[in-house]
């Protein structure tokens, strides 16, 4: 079973996403609400994936992405955020994001991204980031 942590500053949004993922058979280990939570939860739980919002107060998603990948360069971080400009997408992929999923999105599309990257990970394949 694929395990994730959900990092989203909107508490209701985090809960809805977590519940939808659980319904689809994804193991949601924990929820966090800023980039610092992302780093602390990743170090503690070592999930298969981090689903990371970008626009959050205090410590944003860029902070979380950088710090998680400094700790574990093989970490799989999927950015799930609204209003990501093209230059930000390039910055995120250069920083090491495994995928960028723009809100709003279909849940099946997000699950497909998780499954694709998980297969690549299991088969030790290195691929380019997925952007949808």
Labelled PLM ranges:
Residues 15, 63, 84-101:
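Alpha4 helix (beta4-alpha4-beta5 surface) of REC/receiver domains from two-component response regulators
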Residues 56:
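Receiver (REC) domain active-site loop signature in two-component systems and cognate sites
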Residues 87, 105-115, 122:
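C-terminal output helix
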Residues 119-132:
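CheY-like receiver
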């Amino acid at each position: 079973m694929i395990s994730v942590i959900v990092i989203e500053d909107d508490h209701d949004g985090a809960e809805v996403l977590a519940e939808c993922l659980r319904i689809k058979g994804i193991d949601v280990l924990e929820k966090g609400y800023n980039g610092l939570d992302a780093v602390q939860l990743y170090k503690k739980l070592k999930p298969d994936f981090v689903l990371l919002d970008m626009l959050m107060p205090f410590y944003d998603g860029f902070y979380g992405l950088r710090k998680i990948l400094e700790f574990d360069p093989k970490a799989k971080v999927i950015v799930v955020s609204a209003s990501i400009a093209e230059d930000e997408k390039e910055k995120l992929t250069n920083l090491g994001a495994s995928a960028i999923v723009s809100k709003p999105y279909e849940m099946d599309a997000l699950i497909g991204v998780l499954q694709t990257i998980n297969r690549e990970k299991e088969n030790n394949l290195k691929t380019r980031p997925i952007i949808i």
